[in-house]
Amino acid sequence: MSAPQAKILSQAPTELELQVAQAFVELENSSPELKAELRPLQFKSIREIDVAGGKKALAIFVPVPSLAGFHKVQTKLTRELEKKFQDRHVIFLAERRILPKPSRTSRQVQKRPRSRTLTAVHDKILEDLVFPTEIVGKRVRYLVGGNKIQKVLLDSKDVQQIDYKLESFQAVYNKLTGKQIVFEIPSETH
């Protein structure tokens, strides 16, 4: 049996992080099918983000190398954590870093990899946010004042799993990136 502290890759965990780590340990001990997959998994931090309607979303940040391990059990893990934390939607995101754009005055030792650019990180956040659903299309709508709203079209086969979470996805993406976004699930009327 592992301690809840071992599930957190942070020096000073918050109360919420300890509660979620305790829920991880309880799930690991209670369900034998999740035990093998959950044992090596750890998370870095958790942010609680307000969503419209008095709900909250828990954005759980995990290290990028262990994201694939979380994806294996994400649907079961999300369902169980949402049972434990009522009125909160659970979202798993990889902890990614954006390197600043090189300027003329700053001397770069190495070339900035594509995966560390702002665009690449924001696209990956979007993919992590809606996992296991696939993004089938993107549109950018330009408003009169110069603002942009990104419209993301999601796969309609997963409508029951994510339909109630679309507002949470919008709030989390807006809070993390500062970009306006609208999620839509196109209907299959051809």
Swiss-Prot record:
Positions of crosslink type Glycyl lysine isopeptide (Lys-Gly) (interchain with G-Cter in ubiquitin): 83-84, 124
PTM comment: N-terminally acetylated by acetyltransferase NatA. Ubiquitinated at Lys-83 and Lys-84 in response to stalled ribosomes, leading to activation of the No-Go Decay (NGD) pathway: first monoubiquitinated by MOT2/NOT4, followed by formation by HEL2 of 'Lys-63'-linked polyubiquitin chains on monoubiquitin.
Swiss-Prot/TrEMBL keywords: Acetylation, Cytoplasm, Isopeptide bond, Nucleus, Ribonucleoprotein, Ribosomal protein, Ribosome biogenesis, rRNA processing, Ubl conjugation
Main location: cytoplasm
Modified residues (N-acetylserine): 2
One record GO biological process: rRNA processing
Single GO MF descriptor: structural constituent of ribosome
Subcellular location: Cytoplasm; Nucleus, Nucleolus
One GO CC annotation: 90S preribosome
PANTHER family to which the protein is assigned, alphabetical: 40S RIBOSOMAL PROTEIN S7, SMALL RIBOSOMAL SUBUNIT PROTEIN ES7
Additional detail: Present with 41000 molecules/cell in log phase SD medium.
Protein family: Belongs to the eukaryotic ribosomal protein eS7 family.
Subunit relationships: Component of the small ribosomal subunit (SSU). Mature yeast ribosomes consist of a small (40S) and a large (60S) subunit. The 40S small subunit contains 1 molecule of ribosomal RNA (18S rRNA) and 33 different proteins (encoded by 57 genes). The large 60S subunit contains 3 rRNA molecules (25S, 5.8S and 5S rRNA) and 46 different proteins (encoded by 81 genes). Interacts with snoRNA U3. uS11 interacts with MPP10. Component of the ribosomal small subunit (SSU) processome composed of at least 40 protein subunits and snoRNA U3.
Protein's job: Component of the ribosome, a large ribonucleoprotein complex responsible for the synthesis of proteins in the cell. The small ribosomal subunit (SSU) binds messenger RNAs (mRNAs) and translates the encoded message by selecting cognate aminoacyl-transfer RNA (tRNA) molecules. The large subunit (LSU) contains the ribosomal catalytic site termed the peptidyl transferase center (PTC), which catalyzes the formation of peptide bonds, thereby polymerizing the amino acids delivered by tRNAs into a polypeptide chain.
Protein name: Small ribosomal subunit protein eS7A
